[in-house]
Structures are given as C-alpha cells and as structure tokens.
Amino acid sequence: MEKLKLTIAVTGLNNTDNPGPGIPVIRGILESKEIKARIIGLAYENLEPGIYMPGMINKTYMIPYPSSGTEAYMERIIQIHEKDPIDLIIPNLDAELYTFMKSQSKLQELGIHTFLPTFEQFEERHKANLDKFGEKYGIKVPHSKAIVSGSDIKKLENEFEYPVLVKGKFYDAYVAYNSDQVTNHYNKISAKWGLPVIIQEFIKGTEVNVVALGDGFGNTIAAVPMRKQFITDKGKAWSGITLSDKEMLRITTDLISKTKWRGGMELEMIKTNSGDYFMIEINPRIPAWVYLAVGAGQNIPEALVKLAMGIAVPPYTTYKVGKMFIRYSWDLLGDIQEFEQLSIFGEIEK
C-alpha cells in the first residue's frame, strides 16, 4: 500500500530538561508505516534543540510568540504556507492553542488541517475551573481557587490548609508551606505567565498520568497510563513506566465519552494510599512523554494525523505494561553558519 504523503508542521521543539512535545510527536509520525511525512519545524527561539537534531526536521521556520497577537502570528503561518505548502499543523504548547482554535476556519480555507479541542472543551478544563469541571463530570478533584492579587493570599487560610500548590495558568507548579512562600511563588508565576494564579489543595499520594486521544465523538482512540519514576525540579518526568490500571483507563474513557474530547490530552492524577484518584490537571494537548505510548504499542501522533486528515482510526485496545522511558542529555554539535542562517533569514533547511 502506498504511503500517504503529507507536509506536517510541528511546534514545541524545545528538548531540554523542560521538553516540548514536538520531537516525540515527530518521532511517532516518522515511525508510521502508513504516512510518509515531510516535517516542518516551527520554532520560537533559534536555540531550540529540535531544530538541529539529525533526521527529525526537513526545514525549520522561526515564528513569533502567540503573545504577539493572533493577526501577526497567523500572518507568519500563512507566509510560510505560501512558500512551503502545509497539509497539517500540530501545535504542542498550551499557550498556542487558543490562537490555532480561533483560526481553524481560516486555516481550513487554506487547506491546512488541524485536530484540536473545541473552545468549550478548552475553557472548562482550565485549572481555575477544575472544581466546576469535577462536579459536572463526576470526577474527584482537589479544591482550587484562582487569585489575581497579592491581597488574596491573606484570605487563603480560611479555605486551605498548608501545604498548598501554587500553579500558573499554563505551566509551573510549586508547593508552598506558608503564606510567605505563596507570595514568592505568586510573584514568580504571575510575572512569567500572567494572571490568574491558581491555589490548589495539596493531595498526598502518587502522581500518575494518562496520555489519550479522543475522536471528537466520544470515542477513546488511544489511552496509556504511566507513573513518573523520576521528576525534575521543574516537575517534568525524566523517566516513567507504563501501568496496568483499569481504574485510570475507566476514568479516561468515561471523561472522553462525556466531553466528546477532540484531540490529544494528558490527565494528571494523584492516587492516594486509600486508592482514590484525584484529577489535578487536564492538559489539552499531547504531552512530552508521548513517545512512551508509541513504544508501548499505541502510536498516538500517527492516529492524530489520520483523524485530522479525515481517515477513520480504530481504537487501540492493548499496550505493553512495564515499558519504560528514560531521558538523557546529549551534546549536539553544529556549525555557526546554521545558527546565523536561522537568525538572519528566519529559516533553515536540513
């Protein structure tokens, strides 16, 4: 059977100790037996390691940050598309998703496919809305509160017991054991990610995660649970192992069925010593550890590409339990000419 030829643009090429999902997504796509992909990298910084990794990306273009505004952002995407036609874009960072969701119809007119959550799905799972989300869908969640001012911190003792988690609206989470630490983390997070900052009840237990893919009609196409075995100081998994956990899969399939989730997602949960599961976060895109799912037998990036292109995908029903991943540091060597070309012209071909 002839492979489906596609030009696929991917973001999230940072592959350091705070990795983006871009390279794992690309690896999954390149391993597909049914898709022959030409990969375009969309980079925000000219030192994102994924740009220079051999065998991953055919051509990289620099793009502005989403904070530059939807119009400027999409103008650059269209400019790239006119020069180098794109069949599909896979945005992999939370901060980009709103811009791409808002521009879906425009992209579709240009022949650029996406496979993203709806606005309602994206908004209701926000950390600030987690209490309502849990109540609506029958999921246990820790108590959360969004704060927008330093004066709100003094009132927290009326609602929370220390320690608490202090979270950014997109990224970052810190444990605080008193109000001074909350203030510290609040200032750091709000300066980086803006407001609100979310205060969340601290649940004792083991953190477990699920990477999943919904087809938009309530069907779970893929779901693989794992436990982080080593976590960096940024809270990212440095190693992990797939689990046999029917309850995690039940929670996932039930949630996708009720929400009719469209696209990739990551569910972050805490399993308590008594066996209860608390949903602490729902990330509306594929996580950076997705290649573990590929290795376990569920090629989620490949399935997402097919769904985006209107190809029916039967649900995965099995995966390998006990499959592990370990991240490592590796020095890539390159020439200054590559860096200069990217800096001056905003593009580079490998």
Which positions does each model-derived feature cover?
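Conserved protein kinase catalytic/activation segment
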Residues: G275-Y277
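Active-site nucleotide/adenylate-binding loops and adjacent lid/helix of ATP-dependent enzymes
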Residues: Q121-K204, G216-G218, K246-L249
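Flexible, glycine/charged-enriched surface loops at secondary-structure junctions
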Residues: I199, R262-L267, P314-K320
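ATP-binding N-terminal substructure of ATP-dependent carboxylate-amine bond-forming enzymes
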Residues: M1-F115
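Peripheral (often C-terminal) accessory segments that flank ATP-dependent C-N-forming ligase machineries
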Residues: E302-K350
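ATP-dependent carboxylate/phosphate-activation module, predominantly the ATP-grasp catalytic core
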Residues: D180, N184-K188, Q200-K260, G264, ...
